[in-house]
UniProtKB/Swiss-Prot annotation:
Keyword set, alphabetical order: Cytoplasm, Lipid biosynthesis, Lipid metabolism, Phospholipid biosynthesis, Phospholipid metabolism, Transferase
A Pfam family this chain is assigned to: FA_synthesis
Top EC class for this record: transferase
SUPFAM superfamilies, alphabetized: Isocitrate/Isopropylmalate dehydrogenase-like
Lineage of the organism: Bacteria, Pseudomonadati, Thermodesulfobacteriota, Desulfovibrionia, Desulfovibrionales
Enzyme nomenclature, EC number: 2.3.1.274
Function: Catalyzes the reversible formation of acyl-phosphate (acyl-PO(4)) from acyl-[acyl-carrier-protein] (acyl-ACP). This enzyme utilizes acyl-ACP as fatty acyl donor, but not acyl-CoA.
A GO molecular-function annotation: phosphate:acyl-[acyl carrier protein] acyltransferase activity
Family to which the UniProt record says this protein belongs: Belongs to the PlsX family.
Catalytic activity: a fatty acyl-[ACP] + phosphate = an acyl phosphate + holo-[ACP]
The protein's name in its UniProt record: Phosphate acyltransferase
Cross-referenced NCBIfam families: plsX
Amino acid sequence: MSNSVPVIAVDAMGGDHGPSIVVPGAVRAARENSLKLILVGDKDAISAELNRLPLDGVAYDIVHASQVAGMEEKPSDILRRKKDASVQVACRLVRSGDADGIVSAGNSGATVACGMFIMGRIPGVERPALASVMPTEKKPCVLLDVGANVDCKPYHLFQFGLMAEAFARDLLEIETPRVGLLSIGEEEGKGNSQVKEAYELLREAKNINFVGNIEGCDLFTGNVDVAVCDGFVGNVALKLSEGLASSLARLLKRELLTGIKAKIGTFLARDAFRRFARFVDYAEYGGAPLLGLQGIAIVCHGASNEKAIASAVGMAGTFVSKGTYHHLVETISANEELTSYGKAVKQ
């Protein structure tokens, strides 16, 4: 779009709580960032939520959508039978140029499918992929893919690395992000056949700081800025880290509230605990960007709270302002020859 202010289409009906969480979260993002909202969904339900909120300085439009993509519905059914579903309408706004990006906490499979078939893919990209931001001892690390593609060929992993590197440049504000390939050992020859072939492609990539193989423990050390893997491995790693963080938090809380000395120590260290809680809070980033589409798309968890929605909408606006989509296009185009070579190699 030519408009200098990012315009973000928000699927107001998505998520476990629909407009009651999504609308306040989106409005919060619009107040905290320079962007315009297009709230997509049931007009009456959206208006009812807006009437409860302070809207001074908030630029927004409402686009009515009569249908909702159910969380348990098949993405293919939603694409074929629910043309007026809020997520479909939001994606069409991006395709038509009326919006720069979409944010949805609804059916993630439907969001991915609608993004691919309505918004379309960046020329040369075969598999759009979901990125997740992982907290580390230093700066965050971008993990890609975390669930959009469970079966991948080597050149898919190669393209994931290209897209994640361009994305990390804007997100982490690092000129040359360090890109690692997740494997079972750091040595060059480690990994299955797909990983080994992807290694060779990434090593030859233009303008990519490829540091070689990394292991699972490297996800949290901060020694790489980008970790590349297929969606099966990435989703397992993501859910494992989320589960571990939740379990450790519960264990820590239980131990810190046992006995008067522990309670006093907890009180004295409360600021440190608050910083740690923010550090591991998924709501700080809000959602997983779906990279490889012709536009910005952020997929949020169905259980997202207001803060998570606000973070996701704000992130979408930031990526529009920074030209992240164009950076992805440039990176993919610069490595088109290697991608073609990877496709030609017998899989």
